[in-house]
């Protein structure tokens, strides 16, 4: 009787989880009834993914807050730049010059080194039509690859998973952070979120604390019952297949087991693999260090997602911005050094983005306000290094409401990465054709 009550309690928990979920789930057939069977299957999938022809890895790095692209890739050859920014303009003799017109912020010494090595492409003037200056909405546009007037339920990475990753390992996408980005939202949820190897979270959770509780609950649900059998074995295999095949219970049980396997694997890899480079002690440095460990440990992930905050520089920008960019450059350089020492550098491409740039003119508080277009950085030994696209004009007559006009649609960058790096068609993911750029 006690066992029946326990089972009923467990079933009720799972039903409530389904009813309160905000996601639409497509329920697959239950394929594994025990932890060991799933683990073997996961290892088989991992081998197929990591040894296949599409074993490239993408790392998406969000520069959250709205990076000032004009003080990142600096048009030091433009008089308009210095006239518009009397308080925060970077002196020409401090700029890390790429040519006689543009150069990098002095905080980006590591990026200049990557550029000189042929491992950095700079896509200039990236944005989209009818730009939105809201942090929330513009981030949503970038993460869902939508038009500024349209609202998409699923993220561009999630749509990639839906279109190209049927049957993939649960760790096909890994976010390093406390909350899953909307970019991962998918019809069939895939991917995991972790802010450190001991603090694993489900992609389905709205917040980190709930995610930890869900993991603990799922672990308890899949422990041995007092009767000596696991939940999936209580009714016997044939009865389970006949009565529960394709049910929501099946999917949740599979989700729990998948999560248990992947979380244990992430923890094990993190403990086993040693870093081969010295990283900054920042949040970004630690995030990229973990990503490098997971790559070195053979986790079958196609897309990693990391974030660096602090770019909403409305006041006293110069020092803060330079420190952020130094952290960015040094963290990414350490990451590339680590991957090179592992022998994995050829497999990895890193791409940065920020939800918008900043206004051309500085403000009275020695900062900048929300703007529009900004550059993107693409890092890796297989990039076509150099400057891509056209730097937007800073001439007052060429501005739109005080902002530079975009010259490259960000979805063209996504299309380039999807087609040339992840080897999949971009139209089903982006909704229509965007002309790829010669990035890789």
Question: What name fits each language-model region?
Answer:
Residues 2-342, 361, 375-440:
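Feature for exported/extracytoplasmic and membrane-associated proteins, marking the mature portion
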Residues 345:
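Conserved H-loop
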Residues 348-356:
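Acidic/histidine-rich, metal-coordinating catalytic segments
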Residues 364-366, 371:
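Histidine/acidic-residue-rich catalytic or RNA/ligand-binding cores of hydrolases
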């Amino acid at each position: 009787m006690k066992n029946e009550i326990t089972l009923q309690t467990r079933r009720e928990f799972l039903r409530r989880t389904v009813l309160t979920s905000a996601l639409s789930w497509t329920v697959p057939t239950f394929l594994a009834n025990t932890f060991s069977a799933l683990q073997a299957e996961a290892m088989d999938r991992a081998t197929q993914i990591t040894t296949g022809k599409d074993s490239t890895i993408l790392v998406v790095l969000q520069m959250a807050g709205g990076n000032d692209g004009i003080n990142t890739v600096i048009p030091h050859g433009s008089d308009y730049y210095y006239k518009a920014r009397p308080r925060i303009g970077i002196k020409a003799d401090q700029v890390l010059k790429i040519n006689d017109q543009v150069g990098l912020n002095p905080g980006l010494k590591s990026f200049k080194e990557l550029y000189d090595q042929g491992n950095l492409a700079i896509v200039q003037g990236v944005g989209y039509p009818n730009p939105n200056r809201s942090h929330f909405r513009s981030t949503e546009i970038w993460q869902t690859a939508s038009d500024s007037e349209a609202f998409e339920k699923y993220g561009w990475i999630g749509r990639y998973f839906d279109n190209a990753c049927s049957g993939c390992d649960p760790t096909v996408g890994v976010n390093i952070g406390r909350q899953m980005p909307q970019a991962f939202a998918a019809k069939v949820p895939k991917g995991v979120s972790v802010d450190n190897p001991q603090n694993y979270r489900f992609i389905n959770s709205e917040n980190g604390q709930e995610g930890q509780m869900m993991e603990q609950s799922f672990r308890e649900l899949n422990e041995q019952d007092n009767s000596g059998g696991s939940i999936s074995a209580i009714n016997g295999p044939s009865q389970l297949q006949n009565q529960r095949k394709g049910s929501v219970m099946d999917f949740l049980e599979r989700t729990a087991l998948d999560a248990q396997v992947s979380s244990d694997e992430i923890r094990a890899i993190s403990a086993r693999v040693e870093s081969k480079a010295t990283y900054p002690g920042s949040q970004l440095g630690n995030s990229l260090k973990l990503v490098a460990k997971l790559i070195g440990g053979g986790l079958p992930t196609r897309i990693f997602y990391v974030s660096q905050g602090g770019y909403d520089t409305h006041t006293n920008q110069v020092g803060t911005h330079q420190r952020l960019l130094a952290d960015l450059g040094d963290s990414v350089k350490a990451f590339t050094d680590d991957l090179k020492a592992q022998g994995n550098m050829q497999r990895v491409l890193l791409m940065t983005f920020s939800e918008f740039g900043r206004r051309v003119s500085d403000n009275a508080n020695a900062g900048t306000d929300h703007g529009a277009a900004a550059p993107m950085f693409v890092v890796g030994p297989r990039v076509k290094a150099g400057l891509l696209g056209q730097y937007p004009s800073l001439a007052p007559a060429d501005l739109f409401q005080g902002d530079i006009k975009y010259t490259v649609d960000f979805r063209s960058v996504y299309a380039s990465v999807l087609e040339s790096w992840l080897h999949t068609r971009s139209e089903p993911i982006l909704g229509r054709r965007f002309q790829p750029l010669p990035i890789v």
